[in-house]
């Protein structure tokens, strides 16, 4: 009869493998902050914005940086049915202009042109990377 009770006690105790550590670790997990790159930020201080940097072929009439490598990563990581806009700052500026001018699109035409140019530059970079065989766009 004592054998039966000992078997029940053994069945009630959990089986712990010998190689595992049963003490709880209390060390906090530190999460590394991603490094910020200069190309990640949009300059909001108007005194520091230089649209003519690099010569005539590099003129830029919008605050965004559509040629940034971060856009390639964000574009490839989005879900197929989701929308990603690399020129969000220009889009928001054109929409704010519409709100200020009571939906008068002709008053905000320069903002819309800047947004269109930003989108063209982004897709031009995407096509050029495709021609050059650069990977990372999700194809």
UniProtKB/Swiss-Prot annotation:
Name under which the protein is recorded: Cytochrome c oxidase-assembly factor COX23, mitochondrial
Compositionally biased intervals (Basic and acidic residues): 1-12
Organism in which the protein naturally occurs: Candida albicans (strain SC5314 / ATCC MYA-2876)
Region annotation Disordered: where it falls in the sequence: 1-40
GO cellular component terms, semicolon-separated: mitochondrial intermembrane space
Presence of the UniProt keyword Cytoplasm in the record: no
Keywords for the protein's UniProt record, in alphabetical order: Disulfide bond, Mitochondrion, Transit peptide
InterPro entries per record: COX23, Cys_alpha_HP_mot_SF
Location, primary (coarse class): mitochondrion
Function: Required for the assembly of cytochrome c oxidase.
């Amino acid at each position: 009869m004592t054998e039966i009770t000992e078997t029940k006690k053994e069945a009630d105790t959990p089986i712990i493998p010998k190689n595992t550590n049963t003490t709880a670790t209390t060390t906090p997990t530190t999460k590394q902050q991603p490094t910020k790159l200069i190309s990640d930020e949009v300059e909001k201080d108007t005194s520091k914005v230089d649209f003519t940097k690099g010569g005539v072929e590099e003129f830029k009439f919008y605050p965004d940086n559509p040629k940034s490598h971060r856009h390639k990563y964000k574009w490839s990581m989005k879900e197929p049915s989701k929308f990603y806009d690399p020129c969000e700052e220009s889009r928001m500026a054109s929409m704010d202009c519409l709100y200020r001018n009571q939906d008068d699109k002709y008053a905000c035409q320069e903002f819309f042109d800047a947004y269109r140019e930003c989108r063209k530059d982004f897709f031009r970079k995407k096509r050029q990377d495709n021609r050059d065989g650069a990977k990372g766009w999700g194809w």
